[in-house]
Design a protein with these regions (language model features):
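Bacterial N-terminal signal peptides
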Residues: 6-15
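S-adenosyl-L-methionine
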Residues: 20-75, 105-139
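Conserved class I S-adenosyl-L-methionine
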Residues: 74-83
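Glycine-rich SAM-binding Motif I of class I
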Residues: 85-89
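Conserved SAM-binding motif I beta-strand of class I
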Residues: 98-103
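A short SAM/SAH-binding and catalytic strip from SAM-dependent methyltransferases
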Residues: 138-154
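C-terminal substrate-binding/active-site "lid" region of AdoMet-derived donor-dependent transferases
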Residues: 150-204
Length: 204
């Protein structure tokens, strides 16, 4: 990636992270989309399978999502739209699970790969750069994602076909259209107006 684009991506993501402490998730999502549209490639933004902007999820929300799914050492966690890898790294580091991230942004994949190597997690964590709609997620025992509702709507039938009975699915902030919520958890953000919703599902 060209140095100027790397700089712009860093500035945009820093702005989004700062906004998380003062905005609601909906406001932060809008801010992120406006910021990242200036730096994400035209090819990505115009692609019909673009799932939405990368919005950094706070560590407390990451842990809560994995706890809600009762992730443990026998699990294989797939994170759809894994961003900078914070969920798949946490799954391995703090929950002793194996994990796979799927992300098509090259810069974010490179950042994740660097973190995996730095933390010595090569045997338990990997990131795949590619289109989620082209991937096989059938090995997963847990699936997580922070996606737009329209993206979940398109992914839902794919997950229903590929995932085995009993697999847990956690959606951050938006419910999956047409799916029955098994459990919902709300977390308060750092500001009075910020909150995060987690939705747990189980494949039947």
């Amino acid at each position: 990636m060209h140095p100027i684009w790397t700089c712009l991506v860093g500035l945009a993501l820093a702005g989004v992270a700062a906004a998380q402490t003062t905005q609601t998730p909906g406001d932060s999502r809008l801010l992120a989309q406006q910021s990242l549209q200036a730096v994400d490639s035209k090819e990505h933004l115009d692609h019909p399978n673009w799932l939405g902007p990368f919005i950094p999820t706070p560590a407390t929300v990451v842990d809560a999502a994995l706890e809600l799914a009762k992730v443990g050492e026998n699990d294989l966690v797939y994170d759809l739209g894994s961003g900078d890898g914070r969920i798949i790294l946490a799954a391995a580091q703090r929950f002793q699970a194996r994990s796979v991230g799927i992300e098509w942004n090259q810069a974010l994949c490179e950042k994740t790969s660097s973190a995996i190597q730095r933390l010595g997690l090569e045997g338990r964590v990997k990131v795949i750069q590619g289109d989620i709609f082209d991937q096989d997620v059938s090995p997963a025992t847990v699936v997580t994602g922070y996606l737009l509702p329209k993206s979940w709507e398109r992914l839902a039938p794919i997950l229903e076909r590929q995932l085995r009975k009993g697999v847990r699915v956690v959606s951050v902030n938006d419910p999956i259209p047409g799916w029955q919520v098994l459990e919902k958890k709300q977390l308060k953000g750092e500001s009075k107006t910020a909150s995060w919703d987690l939705y747990l599902y189980r494949i039947r």
